[in-house]
Amino acid sequence: MNNARPIRRALLSVSDKTGILEFAQALHAQGVELLSTGGTARLLADNGVPVIEVSDYTGHPEIMDGRVKTLHPKVHGGILARRGIDEIVMEQNNIKPIDLVAVNLYPFAATVAQEGCTLADAIENIDIGGPTMVRSTAKNHKDTTIIVNAKDYGRVIAEMQSNEASTTLETRFDLAIAAFEHTAAYDGMIANYFGTKVPAHSNDECHEDSKFPRTYNTQLVKKQDLRYGENSHQTAAFYVDTNLDEASVATAVQLQGKALSYNNIADTDSALECVKEFDEPACVIVKHANPCGVAIGENLLEAYNRAFQTDPTSAFGGIIAFNGELDAATASAIVERQFVEVIIAPKVSQAARDVIAAKANVRLLECGEWAAKTTSLDYKRVNGGLLLQDRDQGMVGLDDVKVVSKRQPTAEEMKDLMFCWKVAKFVKSNAIVYAKNSMTIGVGAGQMSRVYSAKVAGIKAADEGLEVQNSVMASDAFFPFRDGIDAAAEAGISCIIQPGGSIRDEEIIAAADEHGMAMVFTGMRHFRH
């Protein structure tokens, strides 16, 4: 094979020692001479693997507390040398070819994530020699093999064993791409860190100036190509942030069903993030990124039955999310009752999987349990730019709200208000949600005027024969006029939760009092666009 390049000499220098001993042993078994540095060299030597210290190879010791180890012509000349072109120069300078380099970099991200990390700590974990070797080897991938991820050790050894201790150009090119991606992400993390800091009087300290750096660097990895985008004439792919490990649609495992579409992924994200808001067994049904039915119950089956009852028409072809293990009874209720695109839960029992298997096209996802909410950022793409903000994780409890009406909400009303407020956060603005007994009974989403969202919620409830009388209403933002209050009262709403903050708040409160309603202010808005 004319593009195969034999591996006769390798340089191994890794911070993450996972699998490196076994890799080195396999290379040695193939007759490869091994060069190494520091802790990696000690690990190999202690386990009987013949290894040459890089400082012995170059004839130059490590200096400056290890800051300078591999930055030497005998190292980089051996890596960058073009086979068939540079042999005379190599011979004149006593440089031997280095055919494979396995490097992973100082753990900068893990270091700066630690509480109490100083600027000095961060600086000492900026790798210099490692990225230089990675880039050199990747640049010369025509002749040299680079490995930056332990998962590729086995791949390279297998190819060498079947290919006379050589690697193919296809493999080297693929590994070079991974290497450039690796160094780009690494430098991006460093730039992001320093871009949010300003120096203090001490060289060892710095202060956070902003969570938004001057340039924002992130790396997303393609998880899958999609059949098409939001519409069939658009092409699309799904990219994920591999630095985040929270339960999400990005990290979920698909257990069965057709390939996820662009819209499936977007809607599943909306459903899952909404159901995470609840501690009790809960079900969220989403259609076109809006919850069309949300409920909590004694168990998931009851929660699903009640969520479906809100709007069976819209639930057809919807996305269903749960916050507990999906059981067979709930799975049976779903497949017997409706057409569903996606079901997602933190865990799916084997019995539930067996039930859903009868519907081969249903996409079944398992996302794992979730813990505390993350501090990651939210993105919105605009033409020519990107909007970044904190994720909307604002919460209010019973102690945070203020009753502004003459009538106090009852305990049951207050419970429903808290439930309704959580749902409204995930409905497109202008958002109005009607709820009763911890179940949505009408959702008005995305109307350009708030009063029309209130009317839509009432129409939805009436269409499904749901009793609005003495139910509660949540509004994601303040009411600019009293017409929304009047519409709610006409529908039978007894209690309202809203942020407050309108210049007409007094008029709005007076309208609530006029109708005998209770009204609660949260002081927090939940626009969703």
Curated annotation (Swiss-Prot):
> Catalytic activity, per the record?
(6R)-10-formyltetrahydrofolate + 5-amino-1-(5-phospho-beta-D-ribosyl)imidazole-4-carboxamide = 5-formamido-1-(5-phospho-D-ribosyl)imidazole-4-carboxamide + (6S)-5,6,7,8-tetrahydrofolate; IMP + H2O = 5-formamido-1-(5-phospho-D-ribosyl)imidazole-4-carboxamide
Q: Is Glycoprotein one of the keywords?
A: no
Q: Which parts of the sequence belong to the MGS-like domain? A: 1-148
Pfam families per the record? AICARFT_IMPCHas (PF01808), MGS (PF02142)
Q: Name one GO molecular function term.
A: IMP cyclohydrolase activity
GO BP, one example? 'de novo' IMP biosynthetic process
Q: What EC number(s) does this enzyme carry?
A: 2.1.2.3, 3.5.4.10
Under SUPFAM superfamilies, the record lists: Cytidine deaminase-like, Methylglyoxal synthase-like
User: Which PROSITE patterns does the entry link to?
Assistant: MGS (PS51855)
Check the record and name the Gene3D superfamilies matching this protein.
3.40.140.20, Methylglyoxal synthase-like domain
Pathway of action: Purine metabolism; IMP biosynthesis via de novo pathway; 5-formamido-1-(5-phospho-D-ribosyl)imidazole-4-carboxamide from 5-amino-1-(5-phospho-D-ribosyl)imidazole-4-carboxamide (10-formyl THF route): step 1/1; Purine metabolism; IMP biosynthesis via de novo pathway; IMP from 5-formamido-1-(5-phospho-D-ribosyl)imidazole-4-carboxamide: step 1/1
The UniProt entry, under InterPro entries, shows: AICAR_Tfase_dup_dom_sf, Cytidine_deaminase-like, MGS-like_dom, MGS-like_dom_sf, PurH-like
GO CC annotations on file: cytosol
Q: Which UniProt keywords apply?
A: Hydrolase, Multifunctional enzyme, Purine biosynthesis, Transferase
Output the CDD domains linked to this UniProt entry: IMPCH
Domain remarks: The IMP cyclohydrolase activity resides in the N-terminal region.
The Swiss-Prot or TrEMBL record describes its family as follows: Belongs to the PurH family.
Q: What is this protein called?
A: Bifunctional purine biosynthesis protein PurH
